[in-house]
């Protein structure tokens, strides 16, 4: 058998400069079936990645596609910087099944105050686990950051959901069904900046086209965090808007009155179907390696870059997920 071609498996398989390429990448990375992989399968994938990176033969793989499958399975379960195996519900592959349960619960029981409190708390607990599991290996999230973010986001989501439920109780029922989306959006606007406060305070590292460090910018941090918030909200919008529309139609036609126990199962299954597509498509909205014009940076950062590379017009940074 001829040796496998050598490719850089630490870069995504697909072109990240196009939306389609980013979408394909995240479809593989967030594949919920990866959650079902056994410990032995994950270890096999890890060994393939280690050997291929080291330039050794990988007899387990007949084609380069086999290597890529192992790499995406590896990426779905191991921390990209530390290499540690992540807890199952904190993995990217768990996003769709976990958010299906959470979104379905939020949408089905939005009228009950105890249920609103429970599901918003459950959602923020899940978010905290995801943030901790995917924390930076070089700039880890402190325990204080995690607790502060968790408490503020949970409080923000609860205040938003409960106050809006009270405000719309005499309005169109469809508006009431949209309250969970607004609460989730509000929580994201609190949670993500809190979790990444260090970046807002100190800035993120800027690179040129050859990955040479060019400076540190707080403005780039604001841009990166803002795009992450938009991506998170975009992931939630399809399931949390299409589901209310569907349920409103079923309610008007008397289906829910005839089959009242079908309410929660229908919403949960429909949310799951939507999230299969919404999760990777939302992640793909913005490039992971974001770019920003040098002219739009802080004056001192811009001047420093101009001294190093007068001709450089664009710099890049990691926006996070």
UniProtKB/Swiss-Prot annotation:
GO terms for cellular component: mitochondrial inner membrane; mitochondrion. The keyword Transmembrane applies. It is a multi-pass membrane protein. The chain crosses the membrane at residues 101-121, 146-168, 174-194, 220-240, 266-286. The keyword Membrane applies. It comes from the Eukaryota. One of its GO terms (biological process) is serine import into mitochondrion. Keywords: Amino-acid transport, Membrane, Mitochondrion, Transmembrane, Transmembrane helix, Transport. It is found in: Mitochondrion membrane. Belongs to the sideroflexin family. This is Sideroflexin-1-3. It comes from Drosophila melanogaster. The lineage of its organism: Eukaryota, Metazoa, Ecdysozoa, Arthropoda, Hexapoda.
